[in-house]
Amino acid sequence: MKITKYRTKKSLGQCFILDPAIAEKIVSYAGCLEQYNVIEVGPGLGIMTQSILNKEVRRLTAIEKDRRLSNIHSKLKEAHAEYDCIFEDILDVNIEQLLSQSPLKMISNLPYNISVILLLKLLPYIHRFEKLILMFQKEVADRIVAQPNTKSYSILSILVQLLCDVRKVEDFPPEIFSPSPKVYSSVIEITPLLSPRFSVDNSYFAQVLKKLFHCRRKTIRNSLKSCIKDADALFIGCNIDPNARAESLTIEQLCSLTNALKARNINII
């Protein structure tokens, strides 16, 4: 199937990699695949899919929303018994069932319009993967790997890095895609930890982060003054400057603050 015969859908965030050499380079970052079950989200025209299959993967499961691509993936399935393509919206898929077989790796050029939503959906199960090699819009990738005291440091940075080691592998120009997006893209290597870096109640942690980063230029004292009256003593007990802003706090400090707030049964509103 030629790209000229296929009309991409902007609503699906479709930006296809057409050069097999680029696809092979991205797949190479995942390392050996011979004994692995691999997940690919948004296989599109199957260029990356073929590169993964060339690595003698144990099992490759792709999830594709666009049923117009079924002919391509039916042919790949006929040629490779280890391949299967599920035509469904990944956001509607039972993630626990999808990730039931180990060991697991994930390699994907993620649709831009769902990349963050999908990553957050995967986080509760992220420990099941040995490694994820994912293509994001560069701005999103920068947020994932960002450190404190940087413009890109955000809730996304914190939630992902609490559970994983992250590394930006390479930036790619718009020209490698069809259609070409208006921005650069980046490949991120995500290596899940065996356990979180710090112990914290995930649901409560998310509430605290949302409160602190809602107005990121506010001091943490001002951000939490509606929730707790003697906040300064609590901050000092956590070795945190009450005049600091959320964007300057490390993940360890944020977890310590969250645990202290929870210990006092503070309702975050």
Swiss-Prot record:
Its EC number is 2.1.1.182. The gene is rsmA. Specifically dimethylates two adjacent adenosines (A1518 and A1519) in the loop of a conserved hairpin near the 3'-end of 16S rRNA in the 30S particle. May play a critical role in biogenesis of 30S subunits. Belongs to the class I-like SAM-binding methyltransferase superfamily. rRNA adenine N(6)-methyltransferase family. RsmA subfamily. This is Ribosomal RNA small subunit methyltransferase A. It catalyses: adenosine(1518)/adenosine(1519) in 16S rRNA + 4 S-adenosyl-L-methionine = N(6)-dimethyladenosine(1518)/N(6)-dimethyladenosine(1519) in 16S rRNA + 4 S-adenosyl-L-homocysteine + 4 H(+). GO terms for cellular component: cytoplasm. CDD domains: AdoMet_MTases. It is found in: Cytoplasm. It holds the Pfam family RrnaAD. SMART domains: rADc. GO terms for molecular function: 16S rRNA (adenine(1518)-N(6)/adenine(1519)-N(6))-dimethyltransferase activity; RNA binding. It is an enzyme of class 2 (transferase). The keyword Transferase applies. It comes from Anaplasma phagocytophilum (strain HZ). S-adenosyl-L-methionine binds at residues 17, 42, 64, 89, 109. Keywords: Cytoplasm, Methyltransferase, RNA-binding, rRNA processing, S-adenosyl-L-methionine, Transferase. Its main location: cytoplasm. The keyword Methyltransferase applies. PROSITE patterns: RRNA_A_DIMETH (PS01131), SAM_RNA_A_N6_MT (PS51689).
